[in-house]
Each structure stands twice: as C-alpha cells, then as structure tokens.
Curated annotation (Swiss-Prot):
Record keyword Disulfide bond present: yes
Keywords, comma-separated and alphabetical: Disulfide bond, Secreted, Toxin
Protein name, UniProt field: Augerpeptide hheTx3
Domain remarks in the Swiss-Prot or TrEMBL record: The cysteine framework is XIII (C-C-C-CC-C-C-C).
Organism of this sequence: Hastula hectica (Sea snail)
Length: 29
C-alpha cells in the first residue's frame, strides 16, 4: 500500500519497513 514513512512504521514491526522510490511501503520480515 502507499503510505508515508510514519504510517509504515506504525503498520510494520520495528525495523521491517521498506519504502521504494514511489513511497510504497512493504513489511520485510
């Protein structure tokens, strides 16, 4: 999903968020 880094941190476990150039984030755990 598309989100800000703050939203991504809230959605993912600590240290798991990856954000690409288009600011789409995934939880990499």
């Amino acid at each position: 999903k598309q989100c800000t880094s703050n939203m991504c941190s809230a959605d993912c476990s600590p240290g798991c968020c990856i954000i690409d150039k288009l600011e789409w984030c995934t939880c990499d755990c």
